[in-house]
Amino acid sequence: MDYRNTLNLPETDFPMRGNLPQREPEILQKWEEEDIYATVQKARAGRPKFVLHDGPPYANGDIHLGHALNKVIKDIIVKYKTMAGFDAPYVPGWDTHGLPIEQQVIKKLGVNRHAVSVVEFRRMCKEYAKKYISIQKEQFKRLGVRGDWQNPYLTLEKEYEAAQIGVFGKMARKKYIYKGLKPVYWCPSCETALAEAEIEYAEKTSHAIYVKFPVKEGKGVLTDENTFVIIWTTTPWTLPANLAITLHEEFSYVQVQVEKEHWLVAEGMLESLRSLWNLELPVEKRFVGKELEGVICKHPFIERDSVLILGEHVTLEAGTGCVHTAPGHGEEDFNVGKKYGLPVLCPVDHQGKFTAEGGAYAGMKVDKANPVIIEDLKNLHALVHEDKIKHSYAHCWRCNNPIIYRATEQWFASIDGFRKAALEEIDKVQWIPSWGKDRIYNMIADRGDWCISRQRTWGVPIPIFYCEDCGKEIISDETIAKVQEIFREEGSDAWFLRPAAELLPEGFTCACGGKSFRKETDIMDVWFDSGTSHTSVLMERKELAWPADLYMEGSDQHRGWFNSSLSTSVAAYGKAPYKAVLTHGFLVDEKGRKMSKSLGNGVDPLQVTKEMGADILRLWVCAADYKNDVAVSPRIMKQMSEAYRKIRNTLRFLLSNLNDFDPAKDRVAYKDLPEIDRWALLQLGKVTQRVLQGYEKYEFHWVYHSVHNFCAVELSAIYLDIVKDRLYVEGKNSTLRRASQTVLYDVLNALVRLMAPVLTYTADEIWPYVPGVPAGSHVQTEEMPEALPQWLDEALEKKWDTLLAVRSEVTKALEKARQDKLINHPLTAQVDLYPNAELEGFLRGIPNLSEIFIVSAVQLHSAGEEKPEGLSMAEDLAGFGIAVNSAAGEKCERCWIYDTGVGENQEHPTLCPRCASVVSHL
C-alpha cells in the first residue's frame, strides 16, 4: 500500500517564487483601483493623529537611491503608525522653484533666459517641474510608498505661494525682514546670492601669498624707515578691495630685520615664517596688538590707505597674524569694518568681473586676475613669498563652481530677532539621534542673518514695493493681504504679469503722497519656500496637524530644511513646527566611499526594483542602521534577496501546513498546548515585543534582524523541525496536530502583520491566503499583533534554554556520527545520554526527548552509571556525555522512525504502532 496518501502533506497555492518584478505592479494596480490610501484613512478616521510631514524632494530628474532610502523609511513609519492604531495621513510634496530647474531649462531647451520674457521663461520652468513631478510620483509609488498621491503639495501651487507670502508678512511685521548691504555667498556662474545651505565644500588649489604693506604713519610706535606690515591671503583678487589690516589686541607682534627693511608679524608665527621664508628674521622690537591700532599703511598698488585695526577673529593657525581686510568680500571683514566705520568696497560685479573701481583689472574675472595681481606685486617688490595650497573651499551646490564673497544689497531675515526663542524651542524637540540637537543648536547659535533674496526668475517674488517719488520700501499688513489674495487666485505669475498698481490695494498712497510704485525684482530663497510648508501644508490641510509629530530627512537638513522650517515657524508663531526630528545618514559603498558617478559605485533603485523587486529594496532599508551612513552594493542587495527568500519560504511553509485549519473551529486553548508549542509562542511573544519596540524607537534594523533570526533559528532550525513529524504524521484532527497548527497560525498571522510596513507587497499578497481572513480585507488596515502575557512564561524560558543547550550538544554528536558514517540520518539513530546528577534530574522530567532531538530513541542513563569509552563529551555542559548508536527495530514506512513495534499490526505490517493506529482510523 502507498501510505503517502495518508500523510498530511503541506499544500498551498501561495507561490514559492516571489517573482516580484512581475507581481508587484499587479498589486500596485489593485491598490490604485481600490484607492488603498482612502481605504486606510477611512478605517482610521477618528483615531489619534500622527503626522509625518514630508520634506519635499526637488522636482528634477529621476529618483536616486537616496530618495528611495528616504521615502521608504517614511513609508515604514506611516504604515507602522497606521497599524498601531493611529490616523497617520501622508501628504507627499515637491520643491519646485529655484536655480537647478532654471539651469535645466536653459540647458535642455537651449533657452537664453535673457532673450525670452520673464513670464515665458517661468512657464517653461513650471512645465519642466511638473514633468518631473509626474515621473518621480510614479517611481515613488512603484517603491510601494502609500500616500495621497492625487493631492500632493507643490511649492508652485497658488495656495502654497499665498500662504508663504503670509509667513513673510508676519516676519516683516515683527521687523525681522530688512534690506542691507552685506557680503553674501555669491555664485558668479549662476549670477545670484546663495544661502549657507546652498554651499558645499570641496578641495581647491589656491594661490597663497605674503604681501608687504609699507607703513605710512607709524603713530609714534613703528618709527623706523622702511617698515612694512606683512599680510597673507589665499584670495589675491580681493587685494584691490583692501581697506585695513586686522591684528589681535592681545597677541605679541615683533618687528624683525630683513636686510635694510623692518617687517611686522605676530611673534607666535615667527618660527614657521623663518622656516617658510628661509630667513633669520632677528627680532628688533616687540609690541602688543592694541599698541598698533591706528597705524596707517599704504596699499601696495593703489593710491589708498590701509589702517591697522583690531579684531577677535585673528588667529595664529596660518599666515602672519596680520589679516588682510576687505569689508566688501568677507563677513568677518565686514563686521570689523563696520565697527571702525570703514566703507564697504566691492569692485566686483554679478558675473565675478572687476568693475571700474577695480582699476587696472576692470573687466577681468577674479580667477583670471589672480596671476596678474601676483605679477604686479612682484614688479613692485611687494611680494614676500608665493605658494600654492590645497584647502577646503566653498562651492555652489548646483553648478559646483567656486563661489565668492561679495557685498551687495540683499534682503535678510534677522536671526538675532528670534535666535533666543529658536534655541529654547530646540530644547523642547526630540532629536533622533540625540547628537542632532547639538548640531542644529550650534548652527542657530552661530548663524548670521539669513540672505533670503535671489537674483533669479523662477520662484516666489519678494512682496515689496518701492515708492517712485521718495524711494521708500513699501510693505504692510494691507499690501501683504492684497498680494496674498491675488496669488491665491492667480499664483505668483501675477507679480510678473500685472503692474504694481494692480498688486496694491485700490487707491494706495505712500506716506509721502506718492502714487507711483515699482516692484521688487528679486525672488525668495527656495529654502524659504520649503521652510514655510508648516503653514502652507500643515496648517492649511484639515487632515493634517500643526506642529507635525515628525520631520524625517537626511542629516544635511540640520542646516537646510529643519533649519529654515524652525526659523520661519519660530519667527512667525514663536514655536517649532515639529515635535520630533529624525535623521538618516548618507549612502556609501562597502568600502565606505560615497556614491559617485566617477567611481561607478552607485546602485540605481529603479534597476533594483526592475530586476529584484521593491520589497528587496525595502528590506535593505529596514536592515540598515540608517542613522549612520548606509552601505549598499550589488552584493548587499543579493544578500537581501536571499534573506527575503528565507522569510518568504518560512511564511509559505506555515501556510502550506494550515490548508485544513479553521481558526474559528480548530484552535487548541493555550493551557492544552504541549510545552514545545508554548515555547514557540514564548519566542513569538519576544519577537513581537522586540519588533514593536524597534518600530517605536525607529530602530528598524531591530525589526529585520528579529524577524530574520526568528525565521531562521527559532522556527526553521528548532520548532518547525521538531513538529514536522506531528504535522505530517498524526491524525488530521488530532489534538497534537491541531496544537501545532494553532501555533503556526498565530505565528503566520503575527509575522505577516509585523512585516507589513516593510514587505508591503508581499504582506498584501499573502494576506488573503491566511486562514480566517475575510475576503476583500487589507493587511494595511489591520492592527499590529500583541504579545499575550500568558505567552511570556519566564520559568518555561529558563527550562527550554537548558533543554536547547542539551539539544545543541546532541545535534553536534549526531553530525559527527554521520561524518564517521555510523549513521546516515538522525532517524536511524538512538542517542544514549550520560548526564551529571543535576542534568539527569532535569532530563527525567522531559517526556518526549526523541521528538525534540528528532531521533528514533533516547536512552537516559543514571548519573552514577559508568560511562563507556569513546563517548562524545559536551563542549558547553560539564560532565555530559553522548553516545550515538543505531536505533533498534525496523523503519516505519510512513513516518521513517525506527521502532521495535513495526510488524505488530498484521493489517499494516510495515508501520509502527502509532502510524498503524492513525491509518486504521482514516
Swiss-Prot record:
Pfam (any one): tRNA-synt_1
GO biological process, one term: isoleucyl-tRNA aminoacylation
InterPro entries on file: aa-tRNA-synth_I_CS, aa-tRNA-synth_Ia, Anticodon_Ile_BEm, Ile-tRNA-ligase, Ile-tRNA-ligase_type1, Ile-tRNA_ligase, M/V/L/I-tRNA-synth_anticd-bd, Rossmann-like_a/b/a_fold
CC cofactor note: Binds 1 zinc ion per subunit.
Catalyzed reactions per annotation: tRNA(Ile) + L-isoleucine + ATP = L-isoleucyl-tRNA(Ile) + AMP + diphosphate
Residue positions binding Zn(2+): C892, C895, C912, C915
Residues reported to bind L-isoleucyl-5'-AMP: E553
UniProt GO cellular component terms: cytosol
CDD domains, alphabetized: Anticodon_Ia_Ile_BEm, IleRS_core
Alphabetical keyword list: Aminoacyl-tRNA synthetase, ATP-binding, Cytoplasm, Ligase, Metal-binding, Nucleotide-binding, Protein biosynthesis, Zinc
Functional note: Catalyzes the attachment of isoleucine to tRNA(Ile). As IleRS can inadvertently accommodate and process structurally similar amino acids such as valine, to avoid such errors it has two additional distinct tRNA(Ile)-dependent editing activities. One activity is designated as 'pretransfer' editing and involves the hydrolysis of activated Val-AMP. The other activity is designated 'posttransfer' editing and involves deacylation of mischarged Val-tRNA(Ile).
Protein name: Isoleucine--tRNA ligase
Species of provenance: Desulfitobacterium hafniense (strain DSM 10664 / DCB-2)
